[in-house]
Amino acid sequence: SAGMGMNTFIAFTVCGILGYTWGEALTLIVIGPIGVYVGEGIANVVNWLIERSGILTGVLIGGGWSVLVSFGVHWAVNPIMINNISQFGYDYICPLTFACNFAVIGTALGVYLKAKDPQLKGFSLTGIITIALSAIIEPTLFGMLVKNKKLFLAQIIGGAVGGAYLGLMKVVTNAFVFGSVTTFPAFIVNNA
């Protein structure tokens, strides 16, 4: 019976430790490259779209950025923006994400003006201030928009319209910044 206890100890403890070690290594070896290829695929599609139609790209990025943020996939696009800035001195994608952020501000402002519930008014006002100063949309996105499909759709439409306009005007940034009032100076670009 003592031998059975040792076998159980070895099976559950040592094999468990090896399972964690090998599981993480396999994740890095298998899942890591898949993430890289998905990110590169997104990058290629976005750059191809920008070359073909700034308006369509603006609609897709401006309207779809909050969906990408809600799944955490938006981080795959950030290296593209950084590379564009280092290679060309400006980037077309970053301003399109601004459209999403300001559409979230607009939606939260609409909720603030229409809501009767003081807690909802307070939450939406906090969201407006947070996004305007720091460009962090996640609290408002998950706390208010994802829960209400009409608000989420309104934000997506607003972001798409704003993105289309920014794409039409070929607006660029010269810095890798997230869309807020404090980052407007990044739009001052010469010879873009």
Which residues fall in each region the model found?
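Signature of multi-pass transmembrane helix bundles
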Residues: 1-66, 183-192
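Transmembrane helical segments that form the transport core of multi-pass membrane transport proteins
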Residues: 42-96
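Transmembrane alpha-helical segments and their short flanking loops
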Residues: 51-55, 80-83, 118, 127, ...
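Short, proline-centered helix/strand-breaking motifs
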Residues: 1, 136-139
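Alpha-helical transmembrane segments in multi-pass membrane proteins
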Residues: 3, 7, 11, 15, ...
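Short helix-coil transition sites and intra-membrane helix breaks within transmembrane domains
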Residues: 31-35, 53, 68-76, 99-102, ...
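Transmembrane helix-loop junctions in multi-pass membrane proteins
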Residues: 21-42, 71-78, 109-114, 138, ...
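Membrane-embedded helical hairpins/re-entrant loop segments and their flanking transmembrane helices
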Residues: 79-137, 144-149
